[in-house]
Amino acid sequence: MKIWIDADACPRVVKDIVFRASERLKVPVCLVANTDLSRAHTSLITSVRVKAGFDVADDYIAENAEACDLVITADIPLAARVVEKGGVALDPRGELYTEENVGERLSYRNLMAELRTDGLLVGGPAQLGLTDRNRFASALDRLLTKMVREHRSQ
């Protein structure tokens, strides 16, 4: 079992929450980004630096994450790929991507992108607030505890 973080756009506070959970539960973490993140390394935390380019980090995670792994990402197309493979994906606001909701979230994302392209909508999602951080920490704790228990009982 491993936690993968789509690290290019992941807020620092979310990474810190994941790092603390990783240490507490002894679950390895792999940060994937097109920048050097080696300073974050510990015995449980590693990183992979991919080439710069559209979806390169996403492709790496989708190809390497296994069904027993957890992926932290705000990228809905990546989450859809992970869920399709039977994996688990969580966004930085604590929302779990599931087979039931990922298609709808992908459609909504595509609509918003189209509205932005047409100039009918400006900006992106709101900045991560304290409520979001707390929701993420709670969701991560519940999910990881369950996943670790299931993984270690096999």
UniProtKB/Swiss-Prot annotation:
UniProt-listed PANTHER family: UPF0178 PROTEIN YAII
Family: Belongs to the UPF0178 family.
Coiled coil location: none
Pfam families: DUF188
Protein name as annotated: UPF0178 protein Gbem_2221
Transmembrane segments annotated in the record for this chain: none
Organism encoding this protein: Citrifermentans bemidjiense (strain ATCC BAA-1014 / DSM 16622 / JCM 12645 / Bem)
